[in-house]
């Protein structure tokens, strides 16, 4: 995972929730809760923030 210091974005696209870690690295999830949990775990480990876009 990139450690760019940029926030990790969580957003909905069509029926999926996506986590954008930066530098073109994304991850698909079927629920907002799953996406936020994945983003939070990486953010905590790397000292980054999470931005959820409605």
Where are the model-predicted features located?
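Ser/Thr-rich low-complexity repeats and stalk/linker segments
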Residues: 7-8, 20-22
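A short, exposed loop/beta-hairpin motif centered on an aromatic-Gly-Thr core
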Residues: 21-34
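Short N-terminal "domain-start" leader segments
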Residues: 1-14, 44-53
């Amino acid at each position: 995972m990139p450690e760019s210091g940029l926030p990790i974005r969580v957003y909905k696209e069509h029926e999926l929730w996506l986590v954008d870690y930066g530098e073109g690295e994304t991850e698909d999830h079927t629920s907002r809760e799953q996406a936020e949990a994945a983003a939070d775990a990486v953010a905590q480990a790397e000292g980054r923030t999470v931005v959820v876009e409605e």
